[in-house]
Amino acid sequence: MARTKSLSRQIRLARATRGMSVAQVAENVGVTPVSIYYWESGRVRPRDRNLSQLCKVLRLPVRETMALTGR
């Protein structure tokens, strides 16, 4: 649970730092805005493929971000 909260916090902070809306991130990742909301709330963890794309879009370190998923 703590990892999920850390991941959701990291996603939300990176998006805000980049000045991107939920809709912009969703479009660039190839998912719905609802998915981004769920990831940011910690309700759902992104699948590996989506997390990899999210890292590219938000310029997050892939290895460290993947570690937050517990995978």
Regions found by a protein language model. Name each.
Residues 1-5, 23, 61, 71:
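N-terminal flexible/basic segments that precede or flank functional cores
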Residues 1-17:
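A short, Lys/Arg-rich alpha-helix, primarily the initiator
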Residues 9, 19-20, 46-49:
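Residue-level signal for the short linker/turn that defines the boundary of a DNA-recognition helix
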Residues 12, 37-38, 66:
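Key DNA-contacting residues within the recognition helix of helix-turn-helix
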Residues 19-38:
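Short alpha-helical DNA-recognition segment
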Residues 30, 49-65:
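DNA major-groove recognition helix of helix-turn-helix/homeodomain DNA-binding modules
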